[in-house]
Design a protein with these regions (language model features):
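Mixed-charge, Lys/Arg-rich low-complexity intrinsically disordered regions
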Residues: 1-23, 29-32, 39-42, 110-117
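Structured beta-strand/turn binding interfaces of compact recognition modules in eukaryotic regulators
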Residues: 27, 36, 68
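Short, solvent-exposed loop/turn and secondary-structure capping segments
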Residues: 35-36, 77
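Alpha-helical interaction segments
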Residues: 38-39, 88
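Short, solvent-exposed secondary-structure boundary/capping segments
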Residues: 42-51
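Phosphate-recognition beta-domain surfaces
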Residues: 54
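Intrinsically disordered, low-complexity, charged/polar segments
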Residues: 58-117
């Protein structure tokens, strides 16, 4: 599993709901995506977080996502995501860079590292 910065020493209940390769739906902004990497808490710079209009709790898993139908990547808090059960592949130019294959509605993550902030 590809955790970019995941520390599992936190309190129970902070385990991530999604792993790399999982298809997700962003509840607030209504887009499909695939999880590429995750952090146990928000690792974005403070100025990025301050500019985020929603400012979800930083002390929860945050996910690096490839957005379907675009070249956009996003960083989303777990509370804003739900699993996408459509089973449909995500169309994004970086899918082939970060994943080996797609089967059964899930991507198989390779060893390419997600860049840090």
């Amino acid at each position: 599993m590809m955790f970019r910065n995941f520390d599992d020493s936190g309190p129970p209940g902070h385990e991530p709901r999604f792993e790399p390769g999982t298809l997700v739906w962003h509840r607030r902004y209504n887009y499909r995506a695939v999880v590429v990497a995750l952090d146990s808490s928000c690792q974005a710079p403070s100025n990025w977080y301050a500019s985020n209009t929603t400012q979800p709790d930083q002390d929860q898993p945050w996910y690096h996502l490839l957005v379907h139908g675009s070249a956009q990547t996003t960083y989303a808090a777990e509370q804003n995501l739900e699993e996408d059960l459509s089973g449909q592949a995500v169309e994004h130019p970086l899918v082939k860079y970060f994943f080996k294959s797609f089967k059964g509605g899930k991507y198989d993550r390779n060893d390419e590292l997600w860049p840090s902030w």
